[in-house]
């Protein structure tokens, strides 16, 4: 009896204590990182005062650094940047990821932690990582924290912006559909890109994602005339170097005059913290041109999978329980926070082209599958098509676009794209019969379908200007008008007499006719 009374008394006391705690607990307001400076002004009276908030390094484990501050009231906020002064006037930036108790914050380093020791002084900057933005970034190469890495002196910044920001509000966004012409036949005809949209370039290793992106920069950046921001996320340093030199040769970057592109790199050799944040750095540079200057900006990200991969590494370093296939549990949140910032507003637009590496060619892998949800158009590069020697190796049946609407494209373009895909699908279904029984067992109608489909398949190939050094074939940029006319003539049977080889690696149908004449002359000789 006494035992029961004691237990009920403990339960009543626990419940009363819990209710009292809930009533008296201080609820912190939900703050966006756009208002970080304002939040720190409340806490420290000024951002400058926050800079006097000093701590010291308590523990270093790889890219994770624990920093201890004097008292709990002076702890830096989550996502704040901390600075460590290193020899030779260098600085190491740490980003706060967790509050772990005992006046200690756990941070992720944006560079190597070699040489760090316990007790080294750390300064709270009072805001997230801030980078230089404005016209001064054009023609320059920056790293994740906005430092120039092209050995051409400091960047002349209009202002400094934090890399963590809110997406534009619903009222600010614009939704007028407009086609972005690329000059690449297979894209413009079957999966056209939206101006101010998000485009995904999916493919496994070595199918031509980077070459495709470089061709898009070459075609669109020149014709488009606006500003471009190229963000290299966890890819090869050699490719970044090649791109920089090519941009100088083509005049997109001028060392003396006015450049049209800014480059931001966090390559394969960088720590996971840098690779997980460099995409946000590039996006922040693009947002300035959209929001302040009202420009239509092109944002190229190569490779968005490395952003997810780096996030997974950071998550594991912080001790979070992994999700499916070992990815971070916050995969969808991380991706959504970044992708929602890439949009068209009433002031300007950001059109983004993102290369997406597909691990083991598996499109159901959580990383590419999460990216799919945010895209307006998907261009899938297929290994089976690249094995046929058809480049760009775009899968015409797997690539999709929300712009495939007769109200946007017009009836002629929409119907032609449907007819081309139908013919290729019929050819695909007949391939098994051909492999077993041969062409002779097909009906006359099926034989004609196969012949035209093979010509269409070869005609979807195109010589690229950036690949001219490998192929020896001059690059071709084909207008949408010529693309529609060319495919219409092939489907109508106007070029049934031409050999299949005449349609391979040419621009418009006129080039195919000239190539056929050249082949005929060579055979006659």
From Swiss-Prot:
Transmembrane segments: none annotated. It catalyses: ATP + H2O + 4 H(+)(in) = ADP + phosphate + 5 H(+)(out). GO terms for cellular component: matrix side of mitochondrial inner membrane; mitochondrion; proton-transporting ATP synthase complex. The keyword Signal does not apply. Pfam families: ATP-synt_ab, ATP-synt_ab_N, ATP-synt_VA_C. The keyword GTP-binding does not apply. It comes from the Eukaryota. Residues 1-44 form a transit peptide. Belongs to the ATPase alpha/beta chains family. Mitochondrial membrane ATP synthase (F(1)F(0) ATP synthase or Complex V) produces ATP from ADP in the presence of a proton gradient across the membrane which is generated by electron transport complexes of the respiratory chain. F-type ATPases consist of two structural domains, F(1) - containing the extramembraneous catalytic core, and F(0) - containing the membrane proton channel, linked together by a central stalk and a peripheral stalk. During catalysis, ATP synthesis in the catalytic domain of F(1) is coupled via a rotary mechanism of the central stalk subunits to proton translocation. This is ATP synthase subunit beta, mitochondrial. It comes from Schizosaccharomyces pombe (strain 972 / ATCC 24843) (Fission yeast). The gene is atp2.
């Amino acid at each position: 009896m006494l035992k029961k009374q004691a237990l009920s008394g403990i339960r009543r006391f626990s419940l009363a204590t819990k209710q009292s705690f809930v009533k008296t607990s201080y609820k912190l307001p939900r703050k966006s990182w756009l208002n970080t400076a304002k939040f720190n002004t409340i806490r420290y009276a000024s951002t400058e005062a926050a800079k006097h908030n000093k701590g010291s390094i308590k523990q270093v484990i790889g890219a994770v650094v624990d920093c201890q501050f004097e008292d709990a009231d002076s702890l830096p906020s989550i996502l704040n940047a901390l600075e460590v002064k290193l020899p030779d006037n260098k600085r190491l930036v740490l980003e706060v990821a967790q509050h772990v108790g005992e006046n200690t914050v756990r941070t992720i380093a944006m560079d190597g932690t070699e040489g760090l020791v316990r007790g080294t002084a750390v300064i709270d900057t009072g805001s997230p990582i801030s980078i230089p933005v404005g016209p001064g970034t054009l023609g320059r190469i920056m790293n994740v924290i906005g430092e120039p890495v092209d050995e051409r002196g400091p960047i002349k910044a209009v202002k400094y912006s934090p890399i963590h920001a809110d997406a534009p509000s619903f009222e600010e966004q614009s939704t007028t559909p407009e086609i972005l012409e690329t000059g690449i036949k297979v894209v413009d005809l079957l999966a056209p890109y939206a101006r101010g949209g998000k485009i995904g370039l999916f493919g496994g290793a070595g199918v031509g994602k980077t070459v495709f992106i470089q061709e898009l920069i070459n075609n669109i950046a020149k014709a488009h005339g606006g500003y471009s921001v190229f963000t290299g996320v966890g890819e090869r340093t050699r490719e970044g170097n090649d791109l920089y030199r090519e941009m100088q040769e083509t005049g997109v970057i001028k060392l003396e005059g006015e450049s049209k592109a800014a480059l931001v790199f966090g390559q394969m050799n960088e720590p996971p913290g840098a690779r997980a944040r460099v995409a946000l750095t590039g996006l922040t540079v693009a947002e300035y041109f959209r929001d302040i200057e009202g420009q239509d900006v092109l944002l190229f990200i190569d490779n968005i999978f490395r952003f997810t991969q780096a996030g997974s590494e950071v998550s594991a370093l912080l001790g979070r329980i992994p999700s499916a296939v070992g990815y971070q549990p916050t995969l969808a949140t991380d991706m959504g926070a970044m992708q929602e910032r890439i949009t068209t507003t009433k002031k300007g637009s950001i059109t983004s082209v993102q290369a997406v590496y597909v691990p083991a060619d598996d499109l159901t892998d959580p990383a590419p599958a999460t990216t799919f949800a945010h895209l307006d158009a998907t261009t899938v590069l297929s290994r089976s098509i690249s094995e046929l020697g058809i480049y760009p190796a775009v899968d015409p049946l797997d690539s999709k676009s929300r712009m495939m609407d007769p109200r946007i494209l017009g009836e002629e373009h929409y119907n032609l794209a449907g007819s081309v895909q139908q013919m290729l699908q019929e050819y695909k279904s007949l391939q098994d019969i051909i492999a077993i029984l041969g062409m002779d067992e097909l009906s006359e109608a099926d034989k004609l379908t196969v012949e035209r489909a093979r010509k269409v398949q070869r005609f979807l190939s195109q010589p690229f200007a950036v690949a001219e050094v490998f192929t020896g074939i001059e690059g071709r940029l084909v207008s949408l008008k010529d693309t529609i006319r060319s495919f219409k003539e092939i489907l109508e049977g106007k070029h049934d007499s031409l050999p299949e080889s005449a349609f391979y690696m040419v621009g418009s149908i006129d080039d195919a006719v000239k190539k056929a004449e050249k082949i005929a002359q060579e055979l006659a000789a």
